Amino acid sequence: MNQSFSPEVPQSFFQRDALDVARALIGAEFRVGKAGGIIVETEAYHPDDPASHAFNGQTPRNRAMFGPAGHLYVYRSYGIHWCANFVCAPGSAVLLRAIEPLTGIDMMKLRRGTDKLKLLCSGPGKLCQAMAITGEMDGAPLNAPPFLLRLPKEAAAISTGRRIGISRAVDYPWRFGLEGSAFVSKKFEPDQR
């Protein structure tokens, strides 16, 4: 993928609806230290969304979701895999579902234990493992090291579909992906574009 990027993203970018942020992040460059790539898949979550961790209010686990916009909300899924979200308006966030790896690929392969490029970051848990995102980063600001986030100068073509791996609000079309990307966690259905 050959494209140019804007300067780093200001915190104000995140101080809006998570649906808008989730779409705008498609095609953005995201790095943690030297490992990173292009965001190719996201999902949006609102505080009034039954599938959201914020739906029942603030708890110690989801405290970062109610904190400042432009910070990470990191949690463990099923007690196994870390998942990374970008906090938007209070109680809303964007889940990073997949990245197309571009930098630090050898390091990501080592962390993931695979040489298959398409499997390095094709899912929230895989992405966090490859990029060494852990619960210690919960609440960390995205505009400070080790993070780098830059938006594409040109809007990407986006596919839209239902979110994955949830049991509530399953029909919300709040999953977004870079159209035609081979690096998404699950292909978008033809009727969901």
From Swiss-Prot:
Keyword Transport attached: no
Molecular function in Gene Ontology: alkylbase DNA N-glycosylase activity; DNA binding
CDD domains reported in the protein's UniProt record: AAG
Keywords on record: DNA damage, DNA repair, Hydrolase
Top-level EC class as recorded in UniProt: hydrolase
One Pfam match: Pur_DNA_glyco
Keyword DNA repair part of the UniProt annotation: yes
EC number: 3.2.2.-
GO biological process terms held by the UniProt record: base-excision repair
Matches recorded under InterPro entries: Formyl_transferase-like_C_sf, MPG, MPG_sf
Gene3D superfamilies: Methylpurine-DNA glycosylase (MPG)
Sequence similarity: Belongs to the DNA glycosylase MPG family.
Protein name: Putative 3-methyladenine DNA glycosylase
Native source organism of the sequence: Agrobacterium fabrum (strain C58 / ATCC 33970)
